[in-house]
Structure formats: C-alpha cells, structure tokens
Amino acid sequence: MLYYLLKYINDAFDPPGLGVIEFLTFRASAAAVTSLLICLVAGPAFIKYLKGRIIEPVKEEAPPEHRKKKELPTMGGIMIIFAIEVSVFLWARFDDPHVWLIMVAVFWMGVIGFLDDYMKVVLKVKGGLPPRYKLIGQVLLGLFIGLYTWFDPAFSVLLSTTTVPFFKNLTIDYGIFYIPVVIFIITAVSNAVNLTDGLDGLASGSSAIVVFALGGFAYLAGNAVYASYLKIPFIPGGGEIAVVSMAIVMACVGFLWFNSNPAEIIMGDTGSLALGSAIAVIALLIKQELLLPVLAGIFFLETLSVSLQVLYFKYTKMRFGQGRRIFLMAPLHHHFQLKGWAEQKIVIRFWIVTVLFFLASLMTLKLR
C-alpha cells in the first residue's frame, strides 16, 4: 500500500529521491526494516499478554533440560505472521501473483498451526489438532497453489518444468505429476520446520538463513540478464519474491530477539508451519524446489532422523520382539541434548551447518 502511495506521489509531483521506490533492493530493505521493527516494538507487549494465558505444554518424555520450558508462552508465530503480512502489504506489489500466493500460504498454514496450538494450550486437547486435519490443510494449500499456477497464464512459461542442481541444461517436466509434487513439497517442508522447532532459536534462525538464500535466488531469477548468465530459469516479475523474502527473514530475526536462549516466547505450530509453507512455496515459484535438500538440509536431517527412528524401531520390534533405536531421541537436536550438549551449542552448531548448506547451494550456481 505504501509502495502505491509513494509511487503516485512520485509520478504526480516528481520529488527528488522518491524514484528509489521503484528499486527492488530499496523495497526489500524497507520491508526488512519494517518487519524487524514491528517485532521489536510489539514483542514485549505481546509476550506480556500471553504470559500466564498461553503456556506451551511440555511432553513428559522430553529431555530434562527441555522440561524447564513449561512456563513459556507459545503462539509467537502470530507475531511473525503479523510482521510479515504488514511489511509485505506496505512495500510489495500486489499485481504480482507470486506475492499473494506466498502470503496465502503463510496465512493459511498459520491458521492451521494456530488451531493446533489453541487446542493444546487453551482447550487442553492432548496432541492438539489431529494429524489428519493438519494433513488435509497442507494438501488443500498444495492443491490451491498447484491448480492456480497450472491455470494462470502468468505461470505458463515454465509451468511444470524445473531445473536440476549441478546440471546446466538438465530440466525435469513433472507433467501430470506437477500438482502431487507441489502438495508433497509443501507438506514435507512445513512438517520439517515444525519438527525442527524444538530448541530456543533453532527454527527461527535456520528459517531466516534459508529464506535469505531463497530471496537471493529470487532476485537473480527475476532479472533476465542474471538468470541467463547463471543458467537458472527466468521468472518474470519474480524479483518481488525478494521483497517478501526479506520481510520473512527479518520477522524471524525480530522474533529471535525474544526466542534466543533463554527464550521468552515460543513460535509454536502457528509459526513453524507458516514458515515451512513459505519456504516451500518460494522454492516452487522460483523453480528451486530440488535444491531444498541441500539448502534446507538441516530440516531434511531433522525429518530423516525421525523417519529412520520410527522405521527402525518398528522393524526391530517385528524382527526381535523389542524395538531398538538409532538415536537416543528424535528429532536429531534432542539426540544431542541427551548426549550432554548444551542447548546453545546445539543451536549455534546447527546454524553453522545451515550456513554451510547455504554456501553449498550457492556453489550450484556455477558448478554446472
């Protein structure tokens, strides 16, 4: 909205310096600063309101160190989503469908996560929203994104085609499997971020790094010259995704101000599902979804640890009559907790690994 107002003033009166509103880098920076300030200013009052009202339930089987979090307010994802939506509303162009598709994803999965948190902490329903209803919400979002991009002419250039990391001219056409692939990626990534949200600052910090990288890819993909030079798909108008990405990044950083150890608030499923869906949709829109196992490798490893733990336990129980475990506890961050690693050390090391995955993903731009 502020973009359109300033653009009107610039076109009508041509004041010196206001033409900067047309630059993606300026609006991305403005969205980032706005998002950060919203979190920093609103955070203390929001946390004060939630304290004593919305308290995160802690599982009995959680590591001893983790049980200390039982007095922490949750649903901090509301603050993240609010900061993102307001910043994007102010600085992004809404004639670009990429923008509001991401916003729909963030809002929709935020609502699903909110229902889950609300049922757990307010209604005291054990387990919160039943998994099948979460899955239905994720499938519906994937179906909407898939169908919209399939039928909207704005996406007809590439449509169901995507690129393969490390290969210059290799592409894959999903064909009739495009929509199922979209559903799978949105479901998998949103659940992966949700699983990672177990330690102070882990999900918010890791998400900020991943989305920052995706925003960089989006900026390059939205520029025909850069896209041609780097052999990545040119996404007409896709540069607007960079504006949205920076709003998401700094909302995570602003939230991290209060979520870093010792945390004052937890994002809950409200935030983790919303962030996961944003990562998935951005990657899909810029045709970099096959890069996610590298770029979002920490989320992939967390999910893999849970899958391996469950499958191995079931196999050994069937084979030997007693279930055995690969890890002391899954997801992976709890394994290291039980090995005696300090929470801050786990989080910082996971951030470092995420940065390394980020650098590896950048290498794919030239190693083709």
Curated annotation (Swiss-Prot):
Membrane topology recorded in Swiss-Prot or TrEMBL: Multi-pass membrane protein
EC number(s) reported in the record: 2.7.8.13
Pathway the protein acts in: Cell wall biogenesis; peptidoglycan biosynthesis
Protein location: Cell inner membrane
Keywords: Cell cycle, Cell division, Cell inner membrane, Cell membrane, Cell shape, Cell wall biogenesis/degradation, Magnesium, Membrane, Metal-binding, Peptidoglycan synthesis, Transferase, Transmembrane, Transmembrane helix
GO terms of biological process kind: cell division; cell wall organization; peptidoglycan biosynthetic process; regulation of cell shape
Stored Pfam families: Glycos_transf_4 (PF00953)
Cofactor: Mg(2+)
Top-level taxonomic group: Bacteria
Segments traversing the membrane: 30-50, 72-92, 99-119, 139-159, 170-190, 201-221, 238-258, 264-286, 345-365
Reactions the enzyme catalyzes: UDP-N-acetyl-alpha-D-muramoyl-L-alanyl-gamma-D-glutamyl-meso-2,6-diaminopimeloyl-D-alanyl-D-alanine + di-trans,octa-cis-undecaprenyl phosphate = di-trans,octa-cis-undecaprenyl diphospho-N-acetyl-alpha-D-muramoyl-L-alanyl-D-glutamyl-meso-2,6-diaminopimeloyl-D-alanyl-D-alanine + UMP
A GO CC annotation given for this chain: plasma membrane
MF terms in GO: metal ion binding; phospho-N-acetylmuramoyl-pentapeptide-transferase activity; UDP-N-acetylmuramoyl-L-alanyl-D-glutamyl-meso-2,6-diaminopimelyl-D-alanyl-D-alanine:undecaprenyl-phosphate transferase activity
InterPro entries, alphabetized: Glycosyl_transferase_4, PNAcMuramoyl-5peptid_Trfase, PNAcMuramoyl-5peptid_Trfase_CS
Task performed by this protein: Catalyzes the initial step of the lipid cycle reactions in the biosynthesis of the cell wall peptidoglycan: transfers peptidoglycan precursor phospho-MurNAc-pentapeptide from UDP-MurNAc-pentapeptide onto the lipid carrier undecaprenyl phosphate, yielding undecaprenyl-pyrophosphoryl-MurNAc-pentapeptide, known as lipid I.
Similarity-based family: Belongs to the glycosyltransferase 4 family. MraY subfamily.
Designated name of the protein: Phospho-N-acetylmuramoyl-pentapeptide-transferase
Species of provenance: Chlorobium limicola (strain DSM 245 / NBRC 103803 / 6330)
Gene encoding the protein: mraY
